[in-house]
Each structure stands twice: as structure tokens, then as C-alpha cells.
Amino acid sequence: EEPTALIMRVHRSNFKLVGFTEEPELKDMVAAAHAAGVPVVDDLGSGALYNTEKYGITHEPTVQESMQAGADIICFSGDKLLGGPQAGIIIGKAELIAKIKKHPLARAVRADKTCLAGLSATLLHYLKDEAEREVPIVKMMSLTLEQVRGRAEAWAAELGHGTVVAGESTVGGGSLPDESIPTFLLELEVKSADKFLRALRKNNPPIIARTENDK
């Protein structure tokens, strides 16, 4: 038999498993793997750098928690909950990163300068503790309900059309399945919601909306 090369944990970032289910803690996986001389790879998916519970959302494993648990390699996205450009990030032990860099595919999937510049700018906001002010996804999640209501009411007053109603929003990118946060919406009644939605998206700049019950 071939020896085990590694143990990998893949976080369920875009679906939920419900019912009578159990899974080991990452730290226990690391302890068992390291006792056998096997590295552990932790694929976090969205790669949050902050506690999502702060914004009223179920806890999402963070990069820091994975590091503290002792994972040898950690993979996560540069976009989604982190809020930077679309990218795949790999961090971990220097000797393992060096092996990954030597793989023939590494050159084909490496990030370009534009992506690296955007990612660097995003991470700097976290280092400066200004993500809630400068990183769009974090900024949006940190808004209070009253702030969202105020925006919707101001927009309705400016347009002279529409009704402000309570609703629910989801965190994008498949990051938090079956999770929603309370919000306020500007509801517009139009002849064809689908046609109006397409027109909004083709606008310059595009306006991203959604349809519910032909509104």
C-alpha cells in the first residue's frame, strides 16, 4: 500500500449538512496526522479574517483559527468574505510552500500583477484595522439596520417612487449557506420586473437589484 501523503479538511462553504452528523476538530486531526508524520491541509473556502458572529451571522472558520490549530497548509479565497480580487491563496510551512511553487501547474495559475496589487491593498486595510470602512463586503455587513433603513428612505425620497419594506439578504459567493441577515429594501412596482432588472444591470454604472413576486 502507498503511504498516506496528507490529510485534508475541506470546509463546507456553500452547502449545509444537517441531521445526526459529527466531524473531528481540526486540532485533533492535526494531532493524529502529525503523530504519524503526515501534514494537514485545511481548505477554508471563503477565508474570513474576522469573526462573522460580530455581524449576527453564524461563525465561519477563520484563517487565524486554522493557523492556531496547527494546519500545515491553509487554502482560501482572496474574494468572497475576505473582500479582495478573485484569487486562490495558499499559506503555510515554508518547506511545503517551496514544494508547491516547484509544481508545473504553479506557473499556470499564478496571480498577475493587477491581482496582486488589489490583494495587497485589501490586506493592508486589515492590517490597518480599517476593513469595516474600506473593504466593501465587511463595510456592508457592519451596517446597522437603522443605517440601511436610512439609505433606503433617502433613496425613495430622491426617486419619488417606491416603498421601503423589511426583508432578508444573503451573504454572497456561497460563503454562508442558508444564512440571511435582516435588511430594508426599496420595493418598486413595475410592468415587468425581469425586464426592469435587466435594464438596471445594463446601466452605466450597473445597478444590482433582485426580483420577488414580480416586484
Predicted regions, residues:
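Conserved PLP-enzyme active-site core in the AAT-like
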Residues: 1-125, 159
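Proline-rich intrinsically disordered, low-complexity coils
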Residues: 3, 24, 39, 104, ...
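Arginine residue identity/basic-tract feature
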Residues: 9-12, 107-110, 133, 149-151, ...
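Serine/threonine-rich low-complexity intrinsically disordered regions
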Residues: 23, 51, 93, 136, ...
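Short secondary-structure junctions and interdomain/linker hinges
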Residues: 73, 107, 126-130, 162, ...
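Structural motif of enzymes handling amino- and sulfur-group chemistry
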Residues: 95, 103-104, 111-159, 167-168, ...
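Conserved C-terminal alpha-helix-loop-beta "cap" of PLP-dependent enzymes
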Residues: 145, 149-215
